[in-house]
Amino acid sequence: MGHLDKEGLCTQGSSFSWLLRVLNDGISLGLTPCLWDMYLLEGEQMLMLITSIAFKVQRSLYEETNKETWGPATPRALKGTGRARPICESLHSSLQALTASESSRGPSLLQTPPRVPGQQALSRGDKGISVSLSLPSLPSRRGRCGRIIG
């Protein structure tokens, strides 16, 4: 079941499936590869930004469709193609701002931790680290005569 978001657009349950549908159906061919490149290069942290851009493009296409109903028609083949370059430039500047803010936070958790002195790094051939635990031995249950009880 759909609901209205803060932009006033109807959204379905799965935002990723919605994003795929919008990228395939409603956005120009010039913008779609640019958005997918950003997603593939930057991963999940860019998904919200890409979704926001897709919402804006869908909203402008919706408004354009309403203008066609009430005003002069525009060719459907050109719909959405004029906005591809400014949106990509906006995405690029947003990516630069995101990268700058990430670098100001310090090292990422995904980076390799600093090497401890005296510890060797694992090579590709290592199959894992074997850890041997020495457990304390349980006292034997012997009676006074040396016989095992139990």
From Swiss-Prot:
Top-rank taxon: Eukaryota
Descriptive protein name: Putative TBC1 domain family member 29
Domain called Rab-GAP TBC: residue spans: 1-43
Biased amino acid composition, Polar residues: 102-111
InterPro entries: Rab-GAP-TBC_dom (IPR000195), Rab-GAP_TBC_sf (IPR035969)
Signal sequence, start to end: none
Region (Disordered): 102-125
